[in-house]
């Protein structure tokens, strides 16, 4: 990320309308009232991304309960941990602090939040209330 931003900034061609480069960072985010709840809600996306990165077939996203029951195979756990470490997962205060930290670290103008919280069994996967809650809690904490 830092290298890509540096290349963009170094190669930026100013124009009258845009004299300075503008940058943004996209971050996968899961926010819940507690850290433990956020960790549960991120599990379906972790499993989906591990499948994508290891060449497994992509299936419809699992519920939180399905992801917890299946877990991540031991051989893929380091990959899962490495990916999730770059995401923002936590309670509102933790998440807001991490978003601010990332914005400062990469010196970006904007942070684009991609809510990736999973759904519990019986909740429509395509309209995850936890994704809406992620945005609401993060906005309130910012």
Task: Identify the meaning behind each predicted range.
Residues 1-109, 120:
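An alpha-helical appendage that flanks or caps ligand/catalytic pockets
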Residues 1-11, 123-142:
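C-terminal helical cap(s) of enzyme catalytic domains, especially alpha/beta-barrels
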Residues 116:
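Flexible loop residues that form catalytic
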């Amino acid at each position: 990320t830092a290298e890509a931003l540096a290349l963009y900034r170094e190669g930026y061609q100013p124009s009258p309308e845009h004299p300075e480069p503008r940058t943004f960072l996209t971050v996968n985010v899961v926010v819940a009232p507690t850290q433990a709840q956020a960790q549960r809600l991120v599990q379906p996306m972790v499993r989906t991304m591990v499948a994508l990165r290891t060449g497994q077939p992509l299936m419809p996203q699992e519920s939180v309960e399905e992801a917890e029951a299946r877990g991540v195979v031991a051989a893929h756990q380091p990959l899962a941990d490495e990916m999730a470490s770059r995401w923002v997962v936590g309670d509102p205060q933790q998440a807001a602090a991490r978003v601010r930290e990332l914005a400062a670290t990469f010196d970006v103008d904007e942070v684009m939040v991609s809510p990736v919280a999973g759904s519990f069994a019986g909740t429509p996967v395509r309209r995850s209330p936890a994704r809406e809650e992620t945005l609401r809690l993060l906005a309130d904490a910012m």
